[in-house]
């Protein structure tokens, strides 16, 4: 009887042989590719137009794939999957023109923040990930979306500081 090493643990992470990792990752990749085809097309004759739920499904698929990769010690690949999960939520097709400027509609901003928090968790473990171009592009796109609210946030912060100063020492 011959035994073959297929997996081991290293610093709390399960490591697999590369060919096994590719085999186990295949269902995640296939799901992402099928959803991405519809996402890129934006329209399907049978299903209709692209909806928020389609974008969220694609984002969650990227997240599941990222969690799989992270579990198996592929930190940078997991980070890229999490960045993809966040970036699909910033789709221009789901922006509306409001009195403040262009803003995302529905639950997409919340989904973006959920995926971004996974990225930030990995950045805490490995700060070098912030230098990846994908992460920097994602941050730039998000700043563009948040720009209409910057003045409002500054005003709220100013009022909060004034209120704290006014109430300093009172009980």
Residue spans for each PLM region:
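C-terminal leucine-rich, beta-strand-based interaction scaffolds used for sensing/assembly
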Residues: 1-63, 67-77
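Residue signature of alpha-solenoid helical repeat architecture, marking inter-repeat boundaries
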Residues: 49, 56, 93-95, 130-133
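TPR repeat positional signature
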Residues: 55, 62, 97-99, 136, ...
């Amino acid at each position: 009887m011959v035994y073959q090493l297929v997996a081991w643990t290293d610093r709390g992470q399960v490591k697999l042989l590369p060919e096994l990792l590719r085999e186990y990752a295949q269902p995640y990749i296939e799901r992402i590719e099928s959803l991405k085809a519809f996402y890129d097309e934006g329209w399907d004759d049978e299903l209709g137009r692209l909806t928020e739920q389609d974008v969220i499904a694609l984002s969650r698929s990227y997240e599941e794939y990222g969690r799989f990769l992270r579990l198996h010690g592929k930190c940078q690949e997991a980070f890229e999957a999490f960045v993809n999960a966040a970036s699909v939520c910033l789709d221009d097709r789901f922006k509306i023109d409001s009195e403040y400027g262009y803003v995302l509609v529905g639950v997409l901003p919340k989904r973006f923040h959920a995926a971004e928090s996974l990225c930030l968790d990995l950045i805490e473990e490995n700060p070098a990930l912030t230098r990846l171009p994908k992460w920097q592009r994602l941050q730039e796109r998000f700043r563009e979306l948040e720009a209409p609210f910057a003045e409002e946030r500054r005003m709220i912060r100013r009022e909060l500081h004034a209120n704290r100063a006014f109430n300093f020492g009172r009980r």
